[in-house]
Regions:
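DNA major-groove recognition helices of helix-turn-helix
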Residues: 119-130
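N-terminal interaction/assembly modules
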Residues: 1-84, 132-135
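Short alpha-helical "recognition helix" segments of helix-turn-helix
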Residues: 107-112
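Short amphipathic alpha helix immediately N-terminal
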Residues: 87-101
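N-terminal positioning helix adjacent to the helix-turn-helix/winged-helix DNA-binding module
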Residues: 74, 78, 89-91, 122
Length: 135
C-alpha cells in the first residue's frame, strides 16, 4: 500500500469541498451580476456573463459528480486494503478513522481513549509494519 493510496479518500474529499466552494462563489457572482453594480467591457452583456457563469457552474457540478463517484469506489477499496494489511483490530480502527473517515489524530485519540501522542506512535508503527514510504 502506498502513501498516495492511503490519502486518496482524503484528497478526493478536499477536491469535492473546493469544488463546492467554487460553485457557491459562482452562484454569488451570478446573483450580483448587473450592469449598474459591475461595469462590463464593451461587447460583454449581462446575459453573456450569466451564460458563462451558468456554464462554469454546470461544469463544476459535473466535476463534483465525477469526484463523488470516484470517492464511492475509493472508500470500500481502501477499507478492504486496510483490513487485509493491518491485522490488529485497534490498529485497523485507527487507520480507518484516519484515512477513510479523515479524522484528525486528536479526534482519533479521543474516540479510542488514547493520547494524541500515542495515536502518532501507533500510526507510525502501523506504517512501518505495512512498509508505507511517506516521503
Amino acid at each position: 500500500m502506498t502513501f498516495a493510496e492511503l490519502n486518496e479518500v482524503r484528497t478526493l474529499k478536499k477536491q469535492i469541498a473546493a469544488a463546492k466552494q467554487k460553485i457557491a462563489a459562482l452562484r454569488d457572482s451570478a446573483e450580483s451580476v448587473t450592469t449598474k453594480l459591475k461595469p462590463t467591457p464593451k461587447g460583454t452583456t449581462v446575459k453573456s456573463r450569466l451564460e458563462m457563469l451558468a456554464a462554469l457552474t454546470v461544469d463544476t457540478e459535473a466535476e463534483i459528480n465525477n469526484l463523488q463517484a470516484r470517492l464511492q469506489q475509493a472508500v470500500p477499496a481502501l477499507t478492504e486494503k486496510i483490513l487485509a494489511e493491518v491485522h490488529n483490530n485497534a490498529e485497523q480502527t485507527l487507520m480507518i478513522y484516519r484515512y477513510v473517515a479523515c479524522k484528525y489524530f486528536r479526534d482519533i485519540g479521543f474516540l479510542m481513549g488514547y493520547s494524541e501522542r500515542r495515536v502518532y506512535q501507533v500510526h507510525e508503527q502501523i506504517l512501518k509494519k505495512i512498509a508505507v514510504d511517506c516521503s
